[in-house]
C-alpha cells in the first residue's frame, strides 16, 4: 500500500472505530482471572504512544515499532510503539506521544514534517496500569531515527500490509506474569507482535481494510 493511499484513508476516521481481529485477543489458560471492571472505571495512568507511518524507499507505507531492551521495568524485550506515561508538562496525549518518540527514537517531528491524523481506541495495560492512547500520525519523508540505548534495542519499520485484514496471525502460548495465555501475534521480521501493540495495529489494519 502506498503511503499516500494509506494517509488518504486515515484522514477521516470512522465512528465508531472498527475492532481489531478477535484472533489477537488473549485467552487465559491458567492463573488469576482477568478483571471485569470496564475500562473507564479502572484506576490507571494516562499514557500515549505514537503510531507513526513513514514511507519506505519505494514509497510504500511502513509503521515505526521498537524492540524494547531486555531487563527494562515493563515489557522487557517486547515490540511496542514509541511512547510512555504522560508528564505534568504535556499539554495533551498528543504532546506525550511526540515527546516520548523524541526521547526513545530521536524523532524530530518538525524536521520530519509529522502530521497528526487523530487517535485510536484507548487500551488498558494491566502490567503497568497505563491507559494508553494511540496517536496516529505520518511523516512526509523518512525521518532520521536513533534508538535510546537505555530503552530501545532496535527500531523496525514494519510494512503496513503486515497488519491488514488478510495478514497472517500466529497463535502463541506463553507464560505472562502469573498467567498462562494463548494469544494471536503478527510476525514481523524475526519478532512476534502481540498484546496491546498488536491490537492497535489490528484496529489500524481494520480501518485501512474497510471498503
Each PLM stretch: what is its role?
Residues 147-183, 187:
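NUDIX/MutT-family hydrolases
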Residues 1-80, 85-143, 173-211:
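N-terminal leader/linker segments that precede catalytic domains of diphosphate-processing enzymes
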Amino acid at each position: 500500500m502506498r503511503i499516500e493511499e494509506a494517509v488518504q484513508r486515515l484522514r477521516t476516521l470512522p465512528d465508531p472505530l472498527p475492532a481489531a481481529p478477535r484472533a489477537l485477543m488473549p485467552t487465559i489458560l491458567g492463573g488469576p482471572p482477568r478483571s471485569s471492571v470496564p475500562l473507564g472505571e479502572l484506576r490507571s495512568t494516562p499514557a500515549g504512544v505514537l503510531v507513526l507511518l513513514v514511507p519506505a524507499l519505494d514509497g510504500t507505507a511502513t509503521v515505526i515499532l521498537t524492540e524494547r531492551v531486555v531487563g527494562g521495568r515493563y515489557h522487557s524485550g517486547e515490540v511496542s510503539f514509541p511512547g510512555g506515561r504522560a508528564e505534568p508538562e504535556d499539554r495533551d496525549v498528543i504532546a506525550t506521544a511526540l515527546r516520548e518518540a523524541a526521547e526513545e527514537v530521536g524523532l524530530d517531528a518538525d524536521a520530519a514534517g509529522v502530521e497528526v491524523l487523530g487517535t485510536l481506541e484507548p487500551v488498558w495495560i494491566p502490567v503497568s496500569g497505563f491507559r494508553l492512547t494511540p496517536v496516529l500520525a505520518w511523516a512526509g519523508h523518512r525521518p532520521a531515527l536513533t534508538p535510546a540505548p537505555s530503552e530501545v534495542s532496535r527500531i523496525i519499520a514494519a510494512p503496513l500490509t503486515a497488519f491488514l485484514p488478510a495478514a497472517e496471525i500466529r497463535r502463541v502460548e506463553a507464560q505472562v506474569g502469573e498467567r498462562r495465555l494463548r494469544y494471536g501475534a503478527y510476525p514481523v521480521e524475526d519478532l512476534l507482535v502481540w498484546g496491546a501493540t498488536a491490537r492497535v495495529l489490528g484496529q489500524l489494519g481494520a480501518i485501512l481494510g474497510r471498503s
